[in-house]
Curated annotation (Swiss-Prot):
Principal location class: nucleus
Subunit structure: Component of the RZZ complex composed of KNTC1/ROD, ZW10 and ZWILCH; in the complex interacts directly with KNTC1/ROD.
InterPro entries with a match to the protein in the record: Zwilch
Function: Essential component of the mitotic checkpoint, which prevents cells from prematurely exiting mitosis. Required for the assembly of the dynein-dynactin and MAD1-MAD2 complexes onto kinetochores. Its function related to the spindle assembly machinery is proposed to depend on its association in the mitotic RZZ complex.
Source organism of this protein record: Pongo abelii
Protein name: Protein zwilch homolog
Gene: ZWILCH
Residues carrying Phosphoserine: S88
Length: 591
């Protein structure tokens, strides 16, 4: 028995060490199988961490869990699963989330991790000195009386030597009523760890915005804006954060919010990406048109109107076609909507882009439209004006037409696609410049990286895509910090700095430090979605945590969800369900 246990500890440590070394070398692989039904994954710093909902931890950790079942196996599990189980529901047979291990199995794995790191276990066949591995956390199925949902182990090191380990137990319950006293929690911590004094730290999270599905056919976006506030000491349970707290806005924005004020601009960006993909791959997947008329009809009408005006006035004329592209955003704060409206100074090429991007559905449309335009220029029917600074092929032809001579352009191959892509890029760049400079959020120097014409056209499109995401972030935050210009400016600079150094990432959470006094109206009269107190003394690893939240922080467990019989006529719950988390720990000294 002991020999088998020793071998298990050696093997477990060896597998974890291999994974850790691969990560340090930048080799990222899928979770590895430790046993037939057990897998281990290494969560790097900055990656989504399931423990963040409980401990606010975001460092590198090992996560141990049950191997997800193949879809065909889920039907068999359904038959075996009892009604009382808290393990994730397999009823759909799809999108099965993280799965938990029995509490007993989790304790065994924590024991192997502890054995392997104990310097007193000299009989183990492990190369010395033992490498201190990242913390190990095991998902548990809450099958014990305490409702354990996580077990964790974190090493204590002194001068690069492993001197002990902290063992964590996390429990979670769904309650309609909860009763807890801060002094009782402090006394529990003192008694458990033989302490005379303790420190308490409060934390509250207020959900300012979270997108919801419009209907059954449109899924909710991943946009979420939350205000996190921490302070010390915490004086009572559910204390309102004092103005001396530290506050941070956590912002994650997915572009293309259907109800957002930028929906029309996002549609133009999508069309730009379609053209860029077509130019790169030779295959173009056209968007559904927004116009009832064909692209050729719209362009011909546009040229006829310009001809009647003898080529003048087209830039100042209010373009009703462009106006129709504006999305109805009645649900969005009107003042925010007014900040980003279609520019009134669109030149010929920009108006042409608006018409063609909303109506072109084929390569033939492109060829026919540009044929009409070039013929009108050659005949001298129109002499449209353009903004300065454009290097597009169409702008060169227009400038040549002023002098009565034009280069011959063969509208074949990728040329029509590139021509429309160029004028779209010019138009969108000017849109973004107009907003950022108009709102005094950035200068041309700040934006130079995003609008530089010196890089190849695919890179230009990619950078414009980044710039659009920055704009989406700002517009999403404006309802909350619009009156605080310095906050909007700071957020702009944070985003610009990030995207000059990193690829586009709409899952990235941007963090904006704020003064509680500047956002007190957002939280002082509101209930937090999450409230937590941490009690510790000396080593911050040794702590007791109590948390209350209005949604389950445990992604591998299902809790009771109310059915329709429990809902009132207006759809609200008579009694709200709360989730209480408790984290306790014990310290083991090796030396």
């Amino acid at each position: 028995m002991w020999e088998r246990l020793n071998c298990a500890a050696e093997d477990f440590y060896s597998r974890l060490l291999q994974k850790f070394n691969e990560e340090k070398k930048g080799i990222r692989k899928d979770p590895f199988l430790y046993e037939a039904d057990v897998q281990v994954q290494l969560i790097s710093k900055g990656q989504p961490n399931p423990l963040k909902n409980i401990l606010n931890e975001n460092d590198i950790v090992f996560i141990v869990e049950k191997v997800p079942l193949e879809k065909e196996e889920t039907s068999h599990i359904e038959e075996l699963q009892s009604e009382e189980t808290a393990i994730s529901d397999f009823s759909t047979g799809e999108n099965v989330g993280p799965l938990a291990l029995p509490v007993g199995k989790a304790r065994q794995l924590i024991g192997l991790y502890t054995m392997a790191h104990n310097p007193n276990m000299t009989h183990l066949k492990i190369n010395l000195p033992v490498t201190a591995l990242p913390p190990l956390w095991v998902r548990c199925d809450s099958s014990d009386p305490e409702g354990t949902c996580w077990l964790g182990a974190e090493l204590i090191t002194t001068n690069n030597s492993i001197t002990g380990i902290v063992l964590y137990v996390v429990s979670c319950k769904a309650d309609k009523n909860y009763s807890v006293n801060l002094e009782n929690l402090k006394n529990l911590h003192k008694k458990r760890h033989h302490l005379s004094t303790v420190t308490s730290k409060g934390f509250a999270q207020y959900e300012l915005f979270k997108s919801s599905a419009l209907d059954d056919t449109i899924t909710a976006s991943q946009t979420a804006i939350a205000l996190d506030i921490s302070w010390s000491p915490a004086d009572e349970i559910l204390q309102i954060p004092p103005l001396s707290s530290t506050a941070t806005l956590n912002i994650k924005v997915e572009s293309g919010e259907p109800r957002g004020p930028l929906n029309h601009l996002y549609r133009e960006l999508k069309f730009l990406l379609v053209l860029a993909d077509g130019l790169r791959t030779g295959v173009t997947e056209w968007l559904e048109p927004l116009e009832a008329k064909s692209a050729v009809e719209l362009v011909q009408e546009f040229l006829n109107d310009l001809n009647k005006l003898d080529g003048f006035g087209d830039s100042t004329k209010k373009d009703t076609e462009v106006e129709t592209l504006k999305h109805d955003t009645a649900a969005v704060d009107r003042s925010v909507k007014r900040l980003f409206k279609v520019r009134s100074d669109l030149d010929f090429a920009e108006q042409l882009w608006c018409k063609m991007s909303s109506s072109v559905i084929s390569y033939q449309d492109l060829v026919k439209c540009f044929t009409l335009i070039i013929q009108s220029l050659q005949r001298g029917d129109i002499q449209p004006w353009l903004h300065s600074g454009s290097n597009s092929l169409l702008s060169k032809l227009i400038h040549q037409s002023y002098h009565g001579t034009m280069d011959t352009v063969s509208l074949s191959g990728t040329i029509p696609v590139q021509m429309l892509l160029e004028i779209g890029l010019d138009k969108l760049k000017k849109d973004y410049i107009s907003f950022f400079i108009g709102q005094e959020l950035a200068s041309l120097n700040h934006l130079e990286y995003f609008i530089a014409p010196s890089v190849d056209i695919q890179e230009q499109v990619y950078r414009v895509q980044k710039l659009h995401h920055i704009l989406e972030i700002l517009v999403s935050c404006m309802p909350f910090i619009k009156s605080q210009h310095e906050l909007l400016f700071s957020l702009t600079q944070i985003c610009i700095k990030y995207y000059k150094q990193n690829p586009l990432d709409e899952q990235h959470i941007f963090q904006l430090p704020v003064r509680p006094t500047a956002v007190k109206n957002l939280y002082q009269s509101e209930k937090p979605q999450k409230w937590r107190v941490e009690i510790y003394s000396g080593q911050k690893k040794i702590k007791t945590v109590w948390q209350l939240s209005d949604s389950s922080p445990i992604d591998h467990l299902n809790f009771h969800k109310p059915d329709f019989s429990e809902l009132t006529l207006n759809g609200s719950l008579e009694e709200r369900i709360f989730f209480t988390n408790m984290v306790t720990c014990s310290q083991v000294h090796f030396k």
